[in-house]
Amino acid sequence: PFFFNDTATTEIYTLSLHDALPIFLASAANWVVLVCGSEGYGNYRHHADIAHAYQIVKAGGVDPDHIITMMYNDVPFATSNPFPGKLYNHPGDDVPDVYEGVVVDYEKKEVSPENLIKVLTGDESTGKKVLKSTKEDNVFLFFSDHGGPDILALPGGYLHSKDLLDAINTMHEKEMYNKFVLYIEACFSGSMFLKLPDNLNVVAVTAANDQESSWGWYCGSEAVVKGKSLGTCLGDEFSVYWMEDADKGEQKTETLDEQFKRLVKGVTKSHVMRYGDVSFKEDVIGEFIGYPKSRNAVPYQHSFEQWDSRDNEMLFRLYMAQHTTGKEQKKWQQLYEEEVASRKAIDRYFNALAKEAKYYQMPEPVENTECYARAIKQFEDIMGRSDYSLKYFNVFANMCNENPLAFSGY
């Protein structure tokens, strides 16, 4: 503990802000929540994104007890993975295994909206690690997965923007943070924060605006590590860009605003957005992810093969069908044809449900979460869950905004 008498306090205030800051932050701590919300080898990139982020914050000196990781955790050991127990977020021969040493706190169906809310609000009924941060501490959350209008996908269900914003308000009321930064990699991720207040010391940076997909990076023929093809995407454009920037080790000097501007300029396939409170945009990013030294920094390279996240599963299966032989080729060809057939069935469902063009426009913020959730459940009970179908959920949002009683007869 630090004890200051009046004289010492006076002397501290005579220091420059840069010199004094470490003294005042000495009792503060960093907390990090990392969430991979997908499963299946076709979603390799999300697992690799989160594992890479774990390495960055751990190397930055964040207490491992303050890092909470949620990951389905099937991809590292999938039969399709040519490197069992390893994950790579960048192609090449001399690239690090980002899965090494990663501690997963919530896995399989434990990765649910309910548990994520409990983690954020410090609800220990999970019996597992949750945030125990205080009003002196900074919190950083990184999420990588699929999304749709007003929702983020998790293996255990969908996180609606209202529920996330309610959790943030609870954190604010319980004084669980000094400043809170969220980085969100998902399609339509901007839609989660259209109602985020600008006075809570919370800022969210999203891979896409509220109307577009985010994109897989280092995909297909480019996803080659140590001479072996992984067949899918190694990362996502937004995630790869901010983490390979962080790997340079400039966290003591680079500000949140500087990194945001680099992301806006560097991410080419979607529009990086920022929501909430920007009053602390000049804070250095190390205040949230720690101060790692450059750790095998791999120079960022523009990917020449990118996949729309909506098409990733189909393109992955097609790639495998084209690059295998014999029984394996037949298996992947059948899986590819099944995916194409599923997508056509989903197209037909929505064409029959909503014939008017107005329903296909991007909605205003979802006003009736209960109706929206009912619509999604009704669809998935009939058609099953699909990453591809998320592109159509704006139809549900628009119909529910127009008539809150829609889908209530189900």
Where on the chain are the PLM-derived regions?
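Short, small-residue-biased leader/transition segments that mark boundaries at the very start
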Residues: 7-21
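Cysteine endopeptidase catalytic domains of the caspase/legumain-like
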Residues: 24-410
